[in-house]
């Protein structure tokens, strides 16, 4: 438990944002390392995002700024801290009020911990939000995003100017209603659905622990940063938070510090109506160090002491339970659910201004507060310069490790990496695509330094084990096999955090395809936040057989095809599996799902890595003039059925084109000319076959075509029997082809 004794700021100099005197970097040459600035290789910026200029600091400037920073911190008094905290509160109040939408309660209650983190503890460079060795901050209770926006504004981030605060939650605003990493530089991950943020934070901390174990040397600590997260009662109630916090404790993520905003208020009222567990005891049982800050409203020294204590614990994550008052300072709405999700209203805003002694106009930042916070720009630039110099020395001593780390940071793939992908011929033995996937996973792990992942307790069924590596565990964090246990939702969100840590970290995760239902929330956020996770989903159809309809996906292909910014692959054999992996590795802003078979499938003639990359392509065709009698379209295990049906139709004198539709989304990206060459508009006789829902297939088969599939649940029986009973056969395809042609 945190000590209640009073501590001065000079007694708690644990802030990593202060350059150290006598640092070796002062005499080290400046490293011009543009790819590390987060500009040319910035992984998580949309095309409309502004490029942020790199800041360079000379040796002399560095020394002056370092001295000034220490002097400023030592002279900081309670008055400027209180004024800064109230500035944060009123920026949040004013933005919500102007937007007539938002959540002022959390920012008002959490402003003290937010201030201490951003002003006294965290290391970051406001002018380069993507500096690699920065501390990461995650607001898991994303509805309180005005807290983070106010902090970014005060800290000097270009992404949150006064005009941005005034356009909160408006069309085209850079500060949307919940934090979005692709909209606001300085926001690490996209949060909003409660529990996702704490899970992302675990992923960020996993990435730091893994990279530190691999690349740090006794004489060079090149990876050294913390992950801080604020979560609320709602996050605690969500099951995903328990999943990931269990793993965080098991893995001993000592550089993960979570602040639990313990305000006892939910949307429906006091948490007593539905949430009465002992959260501290639960976290202790999960292997966390737990501290209780009893006065989160004004107990600044208590918060500082708690952070200092947390940083002293190296072998486990820390939860700091901070008891706060939601809407602190509001005379009539504080400690009430009414301040959670709506503005205070003009009268209550005025009352709050009077109560907290705030005479300023809306959105005003007092000059002494501006001056106090202005040091973070030079300090941050100095920190990055110091790290760049340290990396330059590291690169001289450890060239191979430096090259791998640089690849991970920048996302620049090693030259010729794609040559590692296996290729197959029709003479290659038949195999399940889950087994072929494992061959690809292991091939990629040999050539991609940032490739890592695991399964939700199904590694031996999903075939996801990296054979040349051990398990990532508390004492072996340098290894690359992640054991997630039966925690699908947590697994997905942790991988989002890993992917968003560094562009060259390429995480994959696996379970049975049907159990994506347990992790869909994380997968949607992956697509939204442009996190290039690879989802290895096996047992992709009724082909899994006897386990029955609880384990047989039906609607899943269609549902993911409806989701924006995600690639839904269903490869038919080895070449298509390799093609899917090639695209998945290259598409770092788009997650990919590989739906893979349990049953063995033949290596088909005509398939290719290049064809799979186009999403849909011609596998075989005995017609001329781009006008076959009928086009058969198959995916995955049913491409073999389409090929067999084509052979039967050819025997009857038909000209038949077989098309493999590996990925609808990639096919849609192709030119109109290419699509016309594959599915000519003049040929309306089309039949699709897929062991799943027929929903959406009309787009490709047209009104005159026919989609063969399954629009009900499956059954428990041997796979061959189920295929026959559901009409997923070559005979059914032949009959349909004759009907439409």
From Swiss-Prot:
Pathway assignment: Carbohydrate biosynthesis; Calvin cycle
Interval spanned by the transit peptide: 1-67
Domain of life (superkingdom): Eukaryota
Statement: the UniProt record of this protein carries the keyword Ion transport: no
Compartment list: Plastid, Chloroplast thylakoid membrane
Manner of cofactor binding, per the entry note: Binds 1 Mg(2+) ion per subunit. Can also utilize other divalent metal cations, such as Ca(2+), Mn(2+) and Co(2+).
Site (Important for catalytic activity): 103, 340
One cellular-component annotation, GO: cytosol
UniProt keyword annotations, A-Z: Calcium, Chloroplast, Magnesium, Membrane, Metal-binding, Plastid, Thiamine pyrophosphate, Thylakoid, Transferase, Transit peptide
Transmembrane segments annotated in the record for this chain: none
Binding-site residues, substrate: 103, 340, 434, 461, 539, 547, 598
Keyword Transit peptide attached: yes
Cofactor dependency: Mg(2+); Ca(2+); Mn(2+); Co(2+)
Annotated EC: 2.2.1.1
UniProt-annotated catalytic positions: 488 (proton donor)
MF terms in GO: metal ion binding; transketolase activity
Pfam families reported for this sequence: Transket_pyr, Transketolase_C_1, Transketolase_N
GO biological process: pentose-phosphate shunt; reductive pentose-phosphate cycle
Binding sites annotated in the UniProt record for Mg(2+): 233, 263, 265
UniProt binding sites for thiamine diphosphate: 143, 192-194, 234, 263, 340, 488, 515
Catalysis performed (reactions): D-sedoheptulose 7-phosphate + D-glyceraldehyde 3-phosphate = aldehydo-D-ribose 5-phosphate + D-xylulose 5-phosphate
Quaternary structure annotation from Swiss-Prot or TrEMBL: Homodimer.
Similarity comment text for this entry: Belongs to the transketolase family.
UniProt function note: Catalyzes the reversible transfer of a two-carbon ketol group from fructose-6-phosphate or sedoheptulose-7-phosphate to glyceraldehyde-3-phosphate to yield xylulose-5-phosphate and erythrose-4-phosphate or ribose-5-phosphate, respectively.
Protein name per its UniProtKB record: Transketolase, chloroplastic
Native species: Solanum tuberosum
């Amino acid at each position: 438990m945190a000590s209640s004794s009073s501590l001065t700021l000079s007694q708690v100099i644990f802030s990593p944002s202060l350059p150290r005197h006598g640092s070796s970097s002062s005499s080290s040459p400046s490293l011009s390392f543009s790819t590390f600035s987060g500009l040319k290789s910035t992984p998580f910026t949309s095309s409309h995002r502004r490029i942020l200029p790199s800041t360079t600091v000379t040796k002399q400037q560095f020394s002056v700024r370092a001295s000034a920073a220490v002097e400023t911190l030592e002279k900081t008094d309670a008055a400027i801290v209180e004024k800064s905290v109230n500035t944060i509160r009123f920026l949040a109040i004013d933005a919500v009020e102007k937007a007539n939408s938002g959540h002022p309660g959390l920012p008002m209650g959490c402003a003290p911990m937010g201030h201490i983190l951003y002003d006294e503890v965290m290391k970051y460079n406001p002018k380069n939000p993507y500096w690699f060795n920065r501390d990461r901050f995650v607001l898991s209770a994303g509805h309180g995003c005005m807290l983070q926006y106010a902090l970014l504004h005060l800290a000097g981030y270009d992404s949150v100017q006064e005009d941005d605060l005034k356009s909160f939650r408006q069309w085209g605003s850079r500060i949307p209603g919940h934090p979005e990493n692709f909209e606001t530089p300085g926001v690490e991950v996209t949060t909003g659905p409660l529990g996702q943020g704490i899970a992302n934070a675990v992923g960020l901390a996993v990435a730091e622990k893994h990279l530190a174990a691999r690349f740090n040397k006794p004489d060079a600590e090149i990876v050294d940063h913390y992950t801080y997260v604020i979560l609320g009662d709602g996050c605690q109630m969500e099951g995903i938070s328990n999943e990931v916090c269990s793993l965080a404790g098991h893995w001993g993520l000592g550089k993960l510090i979570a602040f639990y905003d313990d305000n006892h208020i939910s949307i429906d009222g006091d948490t007593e109506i539905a949430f009465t567990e002992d959260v501290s005891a639960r976290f202790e049982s999960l292997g966390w160090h737990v501290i209780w800050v009893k006065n989160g409203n004004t107990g600044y020294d208590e918060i500082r002491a708690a952070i200092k204590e947390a940083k002293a614990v190296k072998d486990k994550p820390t939860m700091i339970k901070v008891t706060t008052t939601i809407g602190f300072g509001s005379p009539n709405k504080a400690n009430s659910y009414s301040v959670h999700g709506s503005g205070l209203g003009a009268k209550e805003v005025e009352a709050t201004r009077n109560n907290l002694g705030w005479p300023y106009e809306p959105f005003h930042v007092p000059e002494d507060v501006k001056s106090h916070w202005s040091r973070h720009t030079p300090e941050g630039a100095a920190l990055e310069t110091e790290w760049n110099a340290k990396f330059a020395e590291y690169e001289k001593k450890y060239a191979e490790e430096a090259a791998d780390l640089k690849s991970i940071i920048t996302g620049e793939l090693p030259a010729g990496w794609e040559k590692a992908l296996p290729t197959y011929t029709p003479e290659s033995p038949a195999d399940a695509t889950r087994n072929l996937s494992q061959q690809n996973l292991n091939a990629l792990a040999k050539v991609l330094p940032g490739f890592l992942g695991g399964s939700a307790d199904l590694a031996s069924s999903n075939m996801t084990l990296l054979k040349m590596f051990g398990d990532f565990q508390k004492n072996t964090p340098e290894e690359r096999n992640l054991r997630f246990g039966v925690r699908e939702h947590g697994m997905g969100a942790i991988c989002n955090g890993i992917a968003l840590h560094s562009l060259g970290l390429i995480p994959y995760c696996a379970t049975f395809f049907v159990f994506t239902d347990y992790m869909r929330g994380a997968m949607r956020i992956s697509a939204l936040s442009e996190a290039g996770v690879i989802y290895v989903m096996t047992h992709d159809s009724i082909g899994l057989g006897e386990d029955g309809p609880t384990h047989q996906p039906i609607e899943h292909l269609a549902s993911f095809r409806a989701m924006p910014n995600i690639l839904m692959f269903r490869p038919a054999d080895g070449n298509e599996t390799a093609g899917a992996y090639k695209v998945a590795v290259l598409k770092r802003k788009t997650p990919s799902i590989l739906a893979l078979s349990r049953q063995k499938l033949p290596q088909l003639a005509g398939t290719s890595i290049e064809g799979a990359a186009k999403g849909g392509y011609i596998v075989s065709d005995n017609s001329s003039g781009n006008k076959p009698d009928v086009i058969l379209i198959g995916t995955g295990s049913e491409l073999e059925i389409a090929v067999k049906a084509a052979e039967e139709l050819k025997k009857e004198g038909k000209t038949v084109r077989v098309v493999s539709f590996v990925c609808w989304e990639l096919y849609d990206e192709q030119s109109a000319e290419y699509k016309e060459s594959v599915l000519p508009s003049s040929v309306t006789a089309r039949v699709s076959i897929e062991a799943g829902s027929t929903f959406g297939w009309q787009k490709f088969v047209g009104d005159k075509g026919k989609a063969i599939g399954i629009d009900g649940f499956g059954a428990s029986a041997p796979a061959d029997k189920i295929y026959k009973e559901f009409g997923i056969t070559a005979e059914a395809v032949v009959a349909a082809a004759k009907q439409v042609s």
